[in-house]
């Protein structure tokens, strides 16, 4: 594809500070020094060898292809077998600070190594899988999982494929068309379509930035990187010392967190799991009432996984509650998020022990026809959303309209509500070290600290 010419490179380089430029160039110079003999360029084999412990081989190949496509000399019509420091610098700056057009030029070459102007959906899908897998790899390698235990979660491989397909479907729906899976994989993707996609779906650029900054340890201490890491993956609390396996996989956590309000993206804490607390509607209510915003996830007896985000604390009341930040989602067999349509305000509902109104927990739709519903009998629920839920435009989320519940789990998101800290600081502090620090800063010391055993949670 032979992307940008040297005239635009200087404009691009103006987006970085001199010290940032020096850090990027230093990385490349260090690679060159490690080769035998004085060299100012790097070939594919050595490039992959140098990154072997930092990134998976499949993505280092794509990075090399992207760097190689950068034309720093407008007079040159041939592509060198080795990459230069200037190419590396331009590549890095374009992907981190470039416009959607500049990013798309590089990413198209990373997707299709034969420099085709038109790509197929399956090529984009494989690129996305490689990028997502690389992000998970570097987070694991550098101990940046923030308390998430991959052994206690759904398989990341399936989650990676699901997220890649979800992002691909957004590429294909930019022009308003919707395709089934095989149609998505076989359909053509133009460079202009990729550019629009990158502009409208910032999550792809987020993955690329994290892969480069964390994987290569370049500019990883800058403020924009810290913001990326907060958006990408929340801190997990409440998962230690438990034997349950979460209904979530890491790609699903990343995707759902991306749709949450920014102020609650930094932390998730486990409130309830039917595997731990039992299959009881009373137990569910007891663990989620007045706990702040939370994600409720259900697995039905057919293996479908889905749920909803409640933007406000759950309260038992006969009226609908919540606001337009609420949404429904599916995780398996399809990863997707369904946001507010504006049709009605039936965001969330929780009621019990009433004779004239439905007793249970629901989101979207209307009484007896919820987008998703857990009955107060707990073992059953429904998703009556044909053709779609009026509140969230979601399809039927469960395998059958009326389903049997296999598992339920609930995660609170954001900081612990202040009223809980004031009401029962002891129990909150045992699971939330940040909350403990806040109380200590306020002068509320813990007299019993030396009298109880230190748990694994305390030492993390």
From Swiss-Prot:
Main location: membrane
PROSITE patterns according to UniProt: TLDC
GO cellular component: cytoplasm; lysosomal membrane; membrane; nucleus
Keywords: Cytoplasm, Lysosome, Membrane
Record's subcellular location: Membrane; Cytoplasm; Lysosome
BP term (GO), one: regulation of cell migration
Residue stretches making up the TLDc domain: 246-414
UniProt xrefs under InterPro entries: TLDc_dom
Function: Activates an alternative mTOR signaling to regulate cell proliferation and migration.
Protein name per the record: MTOR-associated protein MEAK7
Organism: Xenopus laevis (African clawed frog)
Gene of this entry: meak7
């Amino acid at each position: 594809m032979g992307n940008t010419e040297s005239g635009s490179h200087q404009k691009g380089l103006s987006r970085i500070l001199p010290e940032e430029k020096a850090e990027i160039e230093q990385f490349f110079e260090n690679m060159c020094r490690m080769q035998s003999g004085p060299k100012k360029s790097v070939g594919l084999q050595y490039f992959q060898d140098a990154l072997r412990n930092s990134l998976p081989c499949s993505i280092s190949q794509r990075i090399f292809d992207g760097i190689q496509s950068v034309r720093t000399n407008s007079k040159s019509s041939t592509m060198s077998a080795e990459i230069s420091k200037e190419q590396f610098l331009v590549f890095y700056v374009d992907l981190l600070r470039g416009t959607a057009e500049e990013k798309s030029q590089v990413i198209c070459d990373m997707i299709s190594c034969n420099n085709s102007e038109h790509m197929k959906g399956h090529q984009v899908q494989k690129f996305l899988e490689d990028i997502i897998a690389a992000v998970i790899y570097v987070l694991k390698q550098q101990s940046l999982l923030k308390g998430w235990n991959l052994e206690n979660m759904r398989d990341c491989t399936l989650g990676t494929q699901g997220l890649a397909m979800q992002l691909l479907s957004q590429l294909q729906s930019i022009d308003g068309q919707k395709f089934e899976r095989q149609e998505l994989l076989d359909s053509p993707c133009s460079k202009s379509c990729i550019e629009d996609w990158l502009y409208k779906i910032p999550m792809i650029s987020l993955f690329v930035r994290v892969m480069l900054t964390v994987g290569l340890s370049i500019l990883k201490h800058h403020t924009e990187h810290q913001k990326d890491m907060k958006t990408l993956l929340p801190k997990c609390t409440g998962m230690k010392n438990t034997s349950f396996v979460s209904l979530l996989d890491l790609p699903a956590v990343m995707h759902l967190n991306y749709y949450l309000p920014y102020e609650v993206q930094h932390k998730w804490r486990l409130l309830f799991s039917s595997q731990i607390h039992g299959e009881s509607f009373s137990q569910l209510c007891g663990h989620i009432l007045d706990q702040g915003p939370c994600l409720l996830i259900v697995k039905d007896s057919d293996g479908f996984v889905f749920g909803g985000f409640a933007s406000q604390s759950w309260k038992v009341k006969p009226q609908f509650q919540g606001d337009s930040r609420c949404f429904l989602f599916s995780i398996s067999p399809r990863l997707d998020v369904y946001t507010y349509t504006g049709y009605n305000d039936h965001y969330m509902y929780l009621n019990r022990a009433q004779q004239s109104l439905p007793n249970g927990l629901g989101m979207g739709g209307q009484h007896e026809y919820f987008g998703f519903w857990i009955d107060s009998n707990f073992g059953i629920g429904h998703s009556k959303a044909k053709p779609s839920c009026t509140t969230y435009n979601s399809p039927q989320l469960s395998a059958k309209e009326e389903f049997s519940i296999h598992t339920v789990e609930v995660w609170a998101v954001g900081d612990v509500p202040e009223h809980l800290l004031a009401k029962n600081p002891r129990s909150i502090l045992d699971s939330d070290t940040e909350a403990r620090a806040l109380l200590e800063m306020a002068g509320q010391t813990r007299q019993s600290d030396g009298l109880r055993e230190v748990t694994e949670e305390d030492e993390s």
